[in-house]
Design a protein with these regions (language model features):
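An alpha-helical interface "stripe"
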Residues: 1-170
Length: 170
């Protein structure tokens, strides 16, 4: 029986997710993650945000602990647009999940206290909600747990803390 490398396993997983209607997207770093979030939220909410408006959204998303962030996903954010009108930004459609935008990316590098690179990340409406840490055969599962703990400690808070929205580790 041959063993798959982590890269082979990663590519196979991504291919399966694409078959489940996830869009593959290349996100190299935190700046690209934020840029992708803006474009996905614009498509999802059917609106274009100015830089100032999107900064207000990022500020809102950066607040709270992990439990408050889970609540933020389900709530709407009242954004005061530059023209003075209000718009309610949605982050997740809980009533009809088929309306959400699903993406898969791999090898995102974030730099906090240390530089970390994440194996496979699932994004919903641009927010990273699932983190998958792959390990080749022969390594103990404990290695993946240790790695996720390092990520949480060293870089999940970087780039507006978007990785603090991760709801599930696999």
């Amino acid at each position: 029986m041959s063993h798959q490398s982590e890269l082979q396993l990663e590519n196979k997983l991504i291919k399966q997710l694409i078959g489940l209607n996830y869009a593959a997207v290349q996100i190299q770093d935190g700046d690209a993650l934020v840029s992708n979030l803006k474009s996905q939220l614009e498509v999802f909410n059917q609106i274009t945000f100015t830089a100032k408006e999107f900064d207000a959204i990022l500020n809102h998303l950066s607040k709270g602990n992990v439990f408050e962030k889970a609540k933020t996903l389900r709530d709407r954010f009242q954004l005061t647009k530059e023209d003075g009108t209000s718009f309610y930004v949605r982050f997740f459609n809980t009533e009809d999940t088929s309306q959400n935008l699903y993406q898969v990316t791999n090898q995102i590098s974030l730099e906090g206290s240390y530089k970390n690179r994440y194996d496979v990340t699932l994004l919903v409406n641009g927010l990273p909600l699932v983190q998958i840490e792959l390990k080749r055969s022969g390594l103990e599962i404990k290695e993946a747990f240790n790695q996720i703990n390092r990520y949480q400690k060293h870089s999940f808070w970087s780039n507006d803390g978007l990785f603090q929205y991760v709801q599930l580790f696999v």
